[in-house]
């Protein structure tokens, strides 16, 4: 008895792509990338070259125009009088445009230089005796000093008003008799105040000095000073608790400002 055994054949494995195909795809990819880079570089070169050719063409046209104008002036060539007049008028219009642009640029530069040169603004006033019992000090119109009178003014003899925004150094010196009879024993207080364009008022600086019982009158001074930003229409003034104690001699009490 003969027994036969059937053996199953192994599954066939699909062969992968050959090595030559991989090399071909790699070279094709490199070629395409190189071609794209080369095309981009060529486009840039062509654009620059066209710009250069355009500039050269414009220069050539200008050269031809100048040669034609020279021939018109010398009466050379076969150009008619009408053509020469047209060329001359074009040239004159071109010169006028250049001169106009030059003058405009010059005026702009001068205006910018004038704008950069900020005018100096300063004022200094001295006190004036007043019979008024108001706490705001009065300042004498004589002895009123200012560098730019149109940008700072003394209003009502009390306030220094500015017309230009900026940083200002504001100062005040108030001299008072410390042992003169007063209604109270409270310290003498001097305040530097701001009156804003909106109408509100606030204290910028304040200083106090105690009274003295010594005789004769003991002169004491209070000094105030600081840098503040002022807006157009703003004004500053000096306020004291007892104006009857203030000394109004030469150089005793003064007030001023300086734009920085």
UniProtKB/Swiss-Prot annotation:
CDD domains hit by this protein: TNF
Membrane protein topology class: Single-pass type II membrane protein
Keyword Disulfide bond: yes
GO biological process: B cell differentiation; B cell proliferation; CD40 signaling pathway; cell surface receptor signaling pathway; inflammatory response; integrin-mediated signaling pathway; isotype switching; negative regulation of apoptotic process
Cytoplasmic membrane side: 1-22
Matches recorded under InterPro entries: CD40L, TNF_CS, TNF_dom, Tumour_necrosis_fac-like_dom
Membrane-spanning segments: 23-46
Disulfide bonds: 177-217
Glycan attachment residues as annotated in the record: 239
UniProtKB keywords: Cell membrane, Cytokine, Disulfide bond, Glycoprotein, Membrane, Secreted, Signal-anchor, Transmembrane, Transmembrane helix
MF terms in GO: CD40 receptor binding; cytokine activity; integrin binding; protein serine/threonine kinase activator activity; tumor necrosis factor receptor binding
Domain THD residues, every copy: 121-260
First-listed, main subcellular location of the protein, grouped into a coarse class: membrane
Pfam family, one: TNF
Parts of the chain on the Extracellular side: 47-260
Annotated site, Cleavage, chain positions: 111-112
Cellular localisation: Cell membrane; Cell surface
Processing after translation: The soluble form derives from the membrane form by proteolytic processing.
One annotated Gene Ontology cellular component of this protein: external side of plasma membrane
Quaternary structure note: Homotrimer. Interacts with CD28. CD40 ligand, soluble form: Exists as either a monomer or a homotrimer. Forms a ternary complex between CD40 and integrins for CD40-CD40LG signaling.
Record-stated family: Belongs to the tumor necrosis factor family.
Entry function: Cytokine that acts as a ligand to CD40/TNFRSF5. Costimulates T-cell proliferation and cytokine production. Its cross-linking on T-cells generates a costimulatory signal which enhances the production of IL4 and IL10 in conjunction with the TCR/CD3 ligation and CD28 costimulation. Induces the activation of NF-kappa-B. Induces the activation of kinases MAPK8 and PAK2 in T-cells. Mediates B-cell proliferation in the absence of co-stimulus as well as IgE production in the presence of IL4. Involved in immunoglobulin class switching.
Protein name per the record: CD40 ligand
